[in-house]
Each structure stands twice: as C-alpha cells, then as structure tokens.
C-alpha cells in the first residue's frame, strides 16, 4: 500500500518529506489529486475550500485480503480527553463541566460534530451535517465492518517516529535495504519499546 501511495502521488517520492497536510488538502481542492486520505474532521475545511457534498465521498482502503466487500471505513482516534488529578479542584470541576457541555448541550454537540467534524456517539448529540460522518454511519447500518484504529496498542510516540523516519527514507530511495530498515523499525522498534515497558 505504501508503494501505491508514494509512486502515484502528486510529487516525486523523494520530495514527500517536505510536503505537509496543507499541501495535500490544497492539491485535492485544486483537483491535482483524486484521493485525499483524511478523516471526518477535514470536512469543514473542504467545504470552506469550495467543494460540495456532491464533489466527494469516503471509501474504505482495500488491501486485497479477506472479505473486503463487507469492509467499512477506518474509524477511531489516537487521542483521549484527560483530566489532571493533580490540578486544582476548581480547575478539575471546570474541565469536567466543559467536557459535559461538549457532549450534552445543543451548542456543544453542534460545535463538535459540525465545526470540528467529530463523530459524537452520545444520545443527546445532534445529527451531524458532515457528509463523512453520515457515510460512515450508513456503512455501519448496512452491516459493513469498521476497521478499528488501534492507536492505544502502539508502544509509543518514539516508535511511531522511528517507523515514520524509515518510511520517509524508503520513499526517497526505494531499495530493498531501505525497506528492510522499515521492517526493522517496526518489528525491532516494537520489541525494544515492549521491553522498556515491561521490565
């Protein structure tokens, strides 16, 4: 999949390290790119950039394995809301009140769903206008199986950075040796992080 991405991009693979998320969005908005991998949170920026619901859709990423006819979208997050138990009690309560407001009030759920593009899985949440959220919901209702993002099982940010660096080096110079370095960053890096966490 990585080779498919980097060798069919809007730029030379050697230049990918200098590209940003803004570059990718702008290439999509300016019709230089047909595909743009991102999430529901990107919807508002695409609409503000001039696209309409008729201009876009979301598709599962197919890998050619398993029962992909029943595959849904990749869903999840790598972030969580946390409250620092060491903070002042008044700050803790204010934070909890704000979090409650975000997911229970009309204004909060509208902001979360429409302005931020988040899927709000709470009973009091308003129906989102976000096309991507609607498409994900429809796929799930149609019996498609979402592909979970399991970020919480990744060993660390350091591990992600190591794999990312190896992938960047491979994109710039697509040799077997550089691909072996990607495999090593993934496998050996995971083993090292596991050892650090469990010894």
Where are these regions (language model features)?
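Glycine-centered hinge/linker elements that transmit conformational signals in sensory
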Residues: 1-18
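Extracytoplasmic/periplasmic substrate-recognition and gating elements
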Residues: 8-10, 49-116
């Amino acid at each position: 999949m990585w080779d498919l991405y980097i060798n069919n991009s809007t730029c030379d693979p050697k230049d990918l390290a200098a590209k940003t998320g803004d570059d990718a969005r702008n290439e999509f908005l300016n019709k230089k790119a047909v595909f743009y991998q991102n999430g529901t949170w990107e919807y508002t920026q695409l609409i503000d950039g001039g696209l309409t619901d008729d201009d876009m859709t979301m598709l599962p990423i197919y890998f050619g394995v398993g029962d992909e006819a029943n595959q849904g979208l990749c869903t999840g997050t790598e972030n969580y809301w946390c409250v620092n138990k060491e903070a002042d009690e008044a700050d803790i309560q204010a934070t909890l009140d704000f979090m409650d407001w975000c997911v229970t009030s009309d204004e909060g759920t509208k902001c979360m769903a429409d302005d931020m593009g988040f899927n709000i899985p709470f009973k009091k949440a308003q129906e989102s206008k976000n096309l991507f959220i609607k498409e994900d919901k429809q796929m799930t209702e149609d019996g498609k199986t979402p592909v979970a993002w399991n970020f919480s099982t990744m060993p660390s940010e350091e591990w992600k950075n190591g794999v990312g660096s190896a992938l960047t080096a491979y994109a710039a110079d697509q040799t077997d040796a550089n691909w072996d370095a990607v495999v090593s960053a993934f496998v050996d890096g995971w083993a090292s992080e596991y050892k650090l966490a469990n010894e």
